[in-house]
UniProtKB/Swiss-Prot annotation:
It comes from Dictyostelium discoideum. This is Probable sphingosine-1-phosphate phosphatase. PANTHER family: DIHYDROSPHINGOSINE 1-PHOSPHATE PHOSPHATASE LCB3-RELATED (PTHR14969:SF28), SPHINGOSINE-1-PHOSPHATE PHOSPHOHYDROLASE (PTHR14969). Keywords: Endoplasmic reticulum, Hydrolase, Membrane, Transmembrane, Transmembrane helix. One of its GO terms (cellular component) is endoplasmic reticulum. It is found in: Endoplasmic reticulum membrane. The record marks 194 as: Stabilizes the active site histidine for nucleophilic attack. Belongs to the type 2 lipid phosphate phosphatase family. GO terms for molecular function: sphingosine-1-phosphate phosphatase activity. The chain crosses the membrane at residues 66-86, 92-112, 138-158, 162-182, 193-213, 225-245, 254-274, 313-333, 374-394.
Length: 406
């Protein structure tokens, strides 16, 4: 185990500082020390799991791991919003922020290492952030099981429309999420302790959203005053990013990812607030039928449900992609102007560089990168939840656009 112990030196506190905190039984340092010992004990478990490797499992768990990526869920969230219910998409964004954002805060707090790559085989690219908890596990369990709870327990009429029994949907969701969880072990990215911690984060996020946060969202959405609605949420998320712990081992993707998922929840909530204040018009079915008689395209689209939903998803994803590109360019263009207006001082090599002048580069600190993702994904999720207005004018509206559950 000597090699493993050597890996643990990364990001660990000095022995002097450890001694300083020994009197605090529940200090961060003592907890981290306990978790590090457990980490050392569990690395051989990963080696044992990987002793059963074969080509099929390599491929299967590589694909399963993708199903837990936050980018995958952000691409999949529009389907829930446009094909099931607008409010469902918003609440899933909140669960995404809780699971990944909360997980990243824990990652940067305890800075526990991942299984050492010189001992453990990795199926995919080596992860640059820390280990505990597994945010793939947290987001996979959190989002899929909240989807199940929302559609079969909170609003069972939605589940009935799927023509899938509750038991069947439960096993689908369980198979999906457990595949993601085991992929993190098989691929050599996490120890059992990490995925168990991710599962705890997921359960906590589901319970918090189901029994408390969804009522907070309802009160915020129905508030006629912008100050006590979206502005309150903006203040909360800004405080989270300002006080987000930074890893003492150097910058990692965890902090910017928190900005990303916070932006996803913020934009969707702002748009839902606008929906409450200015509801999307309900398409007149008689006029639609009359127009369909004269417009063969409208008639064809509405006669084939798969074509109707496919058209909505295609149009929506194109506009979401445009919103993402232009919001990012706008943020860094504005940031570039502010920086150049206030200083001409050349700094060290940036973590991320975005330049509109090929001869000059601007410096992007981790904080700026996190807030850039907050802004960009606020615009992205705002566009997603605002699409029902466009669908109305394009005559491709469905019940998902106008049904209210608050």
């Amino acid at each position: 185990m000597e090699k493993i112990k050597k890996q643990n030196n990364i990001g660990s506190y000095s022995s002097d500082k450890d001694g300083e905190y020994k009197k605090f039984r529940f200090s961060k340092t003592s907890i981290r020390g306990f978790l590090l010992k457990e980490y050392e004990r569990e690395v051989p478990i990963i080696v044992k799991i990987q002793s059963y490797r074969n080509k099929f499992l390599d491929f299967y768990f590589k694909m399963a791991s993708i199903l837990g990526e936050e980018v995958f869920f952000i691409l999949a969230l529009p389907i829930s919003t446009w094909c099931v219910a607008t409010q469902l998409g918003v609440e899933l964004c909140v669960v995404l922020a809780l699971t990944i954002g909360g997980g990243n805060i824990l990652k940067n707090t305890f800075t526990l290492p991942r299984p050492p790559p010189n001992i453990v085989w990795t199926n995919t690219a080596h992860q640059k952030d820390h280990g505990l908890p597994s945010t793939h596990t947290a987001s996979a369990f959190g989002l899929t099981f909240y989807f199940l709870i929302y559609t079969y327990f909170l609003f069972p009429t939605i589940g009935e429309s799927f023509n899938i029994s509750l038991l069947s949907m439960f096993f689908i969701v369980l198979f999906w999420s457990t595949s993601v969880m085991f992929s993190r072990l098989y691929n050599g990215h996490h120890t059992p302790m990490d995925v168990i911690a991710g599962l705890i984060v997921a359960i906590t996020s589901i319970l918090a959203t189901t029994y408390q946060l969804r009522y907070f969202i309802e009160g915020m959405v129905l508030s006629e005053t912008f100050l006590f609605g979206p502005m309150l949420y903006i203040a909360i998320l800004s405080a989270i990013l300002f006080f987000h712990p930074q890893a003492n081992t150097g910058p990692t993707p965890a902090y910017p990812e928190t900005g990303l998922v916070c932006g996803a929840s913020l934009g969707s909530l702002i748009s839902l607030w606008l929906h409450a204040q200015h509801p999307c018009p309900l398409m007149n079915q008689e006029l639609l039928l009359l127009e369909a008689n004269y417009d063969s395209i409208v008639s064809t689209i509405h006669s084939i449900p798969l074509l109707l939903h496919g058209s909505r998803i295609l149009i929506g994803l194109v506009l979401v992609g445009i919103a993402k590109v232009f919001s990012k360019k706008f943020f860094f263009f504005a940031y570039d102007l502010v920086i150049r207006a206030n200083t001409n001082n050349e700094q060290s090599q940036p973590i991320t560089t975005v330049s509109f002048d090929p001869n000059k580069k601007i410096i992007v600190t981790p904080t700026i990168e996190a807030f850039s993702k907050l802004f960009v994904y606020t615009c992205v999720s705002f566009t997603i939840v605002s699409m029902p207005y466009l669908f109305y004018y394009l005559n491709i509206q469905t019940s998902a656009d106008v049904t209210r559950y608050y």
